Amino acid sequence: MAIKKSAVKDLTNGSPVKLILGFALPLLLGMLFQQFYSMVDTIIVGKFLGAKALAAVGSTGSINFMIVGFCMGICNGFAIPVAQMFGAGDKKALCRYVGNGAVLAGLFSITMTVLVCIWCRDILILMKTPSDILDGAYAYIFVIFLGIPLMVLYNQTSAIMRSLGDSRSPLIFLGISSVLNIVLDLVLVRPMGVAGTAWATIIAQGISGFLCLFYMKKKFTILTFTREDWKLHKHYVINLCNMGIPMGLQYSITAIGSVILQTAVNGLGSTAVASVTAAGKISMFCCCPFDALGSTMATYAGQNVGAKKMDRVHTGILASSIIGSVYSVVILGVMFLWSREISLLFVDASETVILDQARQMLLINMVFYIPLTLVNVVRFTVQGMGFSKFAILAGVCEMIGRSVVAFFLVPYFGYTAVCFASPVAWILADLFLVPAYLYCAKTLRSLFEKNAQMM
């Protein structure tokens, strides 16, 4: 059955550059909103509760990324078959994938919440979290992990909407929740400490998720379900898991390297932790364009592979890489001029060591933003093409890079070595991803040609 595409966005026809920019810009704004209220959390903690509290929240960043990133990867992976069925015009299979994906995501989020809430304090101790910030770190991350089902709700619904070409609606709902998050931060941080900022985050994201769900149910007329769509079918479950689990593992394996690196940073003391936290928040904000381009290419590649248009996939990679490279040069110039002033958002001017170290990390990382562009664009493209296992291997490359720095360089070169950990990880990932993409493209072209000859 052909899909009526007027309610959604078809990325298989038209100028790739215009389509990528048109799709990525709303997605970018949504990510900026998300990072903005994450930054506001950190700014409020640093200014209202002090450098120790800032370090406490920051020390949870890598384990947060590992667990929450795994959940986000699962959700994004579940949306790839939806994009492919949309590109192929198969409405029945599309609805089956959405229904089965929703059931799996619900079961997964509940299980994950129970497990990580039980073990999160032990994990923080294993990571050698400094004793003077351990209680604050636990108070923050426990609440964040309690909110995993709400986070999965938002990411699952927004990923489905993006797979159908709508990157604007999730942005609107995220903007609303961002404002609410800031208000709740200001209300809850003084009486509840760092836990208050965590409650503000999960409440805001939960509201955003429910808004996405209600809107999707009302506006996406192609999503008309039957009871069969909600029953788990072996074929759809296997395909969803083949996409979702590798994509989740990609985030988690990458994050394992970050956890190992964070453990090394923790060994340098709470001042180093605070420096990495401030620089990390700024860097995450600056990296949103790369994430937006990557997520765009996952949907773009998924739809065009479904439509058997490999030339458009290659053109999309080139366009996204050029866009990301131009941005890399611009943001490096901005941070060279004003990185110290921006760091003052997180700590007082008297914290000169933290300010100097944050600037050092920002500048070293941003010199290598062009390799980071390729990591995001090529990895998400490969995922959208259906080769999620290659994304796992790219994550392994990043994990190895960060682990080598943590184990062998940080003990000798201290904080400076920490600053080079991510660039090493990005370069190793690129050395694997570029040949992997060429292999995937060649494989699909051969498959499409073979199928065409048999018809």
Locations of regions flagged by a protein language model:
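Short alpha-helical transmembrane segments in multi-pass integral membrane proteins
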Residues: 1-24, 82-147, 183, 189-245, ...
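Residue-level signal for short hydrophobic patches within transmembrane helices
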Residues: 13, 17-36, 40, 63, ...
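Transmembrane helical elements of multi-pass membrane transporters/channels
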Residues: 22-41, 143, 154, 177, ...
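Residue-level hotspots within the lipid-embedded alpha helices of multi-pass solute transporters
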Residues: 31-35, 69, 109, 113, ...
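Helix-terminus/linker motif at the lipid-water interface of multi-pass membrane proteins
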Residues: 32, 36-55, 124-131, 187-192, ...
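Alpha-helical transmembrane segments of multipass membrane proteins
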Residues: 39-42, 114, 156-160, 182-187, ...
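Small-residue-rich hydrophobic transmembrane alpha-helices
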Residues: 54-114, 151-170, 275-339, 372-386, ...
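Short runs within selected transmembrane alpha-helices of multi-pass transporters and secretion channels
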Residues: 75, 143-162, 170-181, 197-212, ...
